[in-house]
Amino acid sequence: MNKKQILQRLKIDEDYYGDFGNQFLSNSHVSKLLNDPLNIFKPMKPSAAFLIGGYFHTCILEPDKLKKYKVVKATTRNTKAYKDVAGEELCMLEKEVDMVEMLRDKMMDNDICRDLIQGSQCEYEQPQIIDLF
């Protein structure tokens, strides 16, 4: 597989975050290598904070992918309503979605932030490959 084919595969979330992508070091891997080298390829344990951060990232940079998030209309994750819908899955609460959308709106109302994110020269979520050694 040549470099161009590898980069094409790494643009697919399932490949980037799966076994194929784990052949390569990402920025997250480098951080883990420095702070927790024995667990560099161990998946992060799901948490509400990580889920909300991922939703914010997606909301700003990849809004077409928001449909992958399950949203539950419940006040907390401890309610019967939440557990009935979510089961064992960690889901966004409707109030968290509202908060993230408000934060997105605030960020995009700022001319500097909006231009840095949506400017004509912006290109994000683009994997790269370099040889370290």
Language model features with spans:
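Metal-dependent nuclease catalytic cores that hydrolyze phosphodiester bonds in DNA/RNA
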Residues: 1-133
